[in-house]
Amino acid sequence: MAFAKKEKRLKHMQYISTRGTAPVLSFEEAMLTGLARDGGLYLPETVPQLSKDEIGAMAGLSYEEIAFRVMQPFLGNAFSEDEFKQIIGKAYAGFQHAAKAPLVQLDSNHFLLELFHGPTLAFKDFAMQLIGQLFQLSLQRRGERVTIVGATSGDTGSAAIEAFRGLAGVDVFILYPHGRVSDVQRRQMSTPSEGNVHAIAVDGDFDDCQARVKDMFNDFEFRDSVRLAGVNSINWARVLAQAVYYFSSA
């Protein structure tokens, strides 16, 4: 992984597998693919740099504006600036605090970053709500449909189901360990009535759920037949979205 020159940050973003043998993909392709075919994770080939002045200029901006400035350099030409701004606006419209991730001062030396103002009260809403909108626009433009499969111990599953419920072009199946998530999380996953989201209780623990998901991704014939995608932390788009609040709180 190298560091990109500023003038190249928007045009030549490519994503490579950590294991080095999977095809090189664009941001959009890497996002829709999830786990690389060689078993690695997709990461940017080059890392765009933000200067001190650019970071300093974020002071006082809204969370949405900061999100745009932090993430846009990693997208290449996947979305126009206007498209991405609209995506960000839709993603965070349902948060219950104007600041989205307010930094609260407790005393002279202690601050608390509140990450519970999303629709499921989990910090993972910050990434899932954005990924849902990114997936929907990408799939609509491509005329494609994907099947998202994930494993959860609670908060990932509820955040994913909330983000993708009712969206076109996506079916979501979340595996969770039976009797090992909180009642609130179970209800968040199992009560949405939209036909494209499904919560599946597995007799076992989280590792058993994760093993089943990995088996599906490693079965290339099955993976291709249902166009499998993932939104667990294997997906770079999720990691990128969750980096924004470090800038907003700085």
Residue ranges and their predicted role:
Residues 2-250:
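PLP-dependent amino-acid enzyme catalytic core
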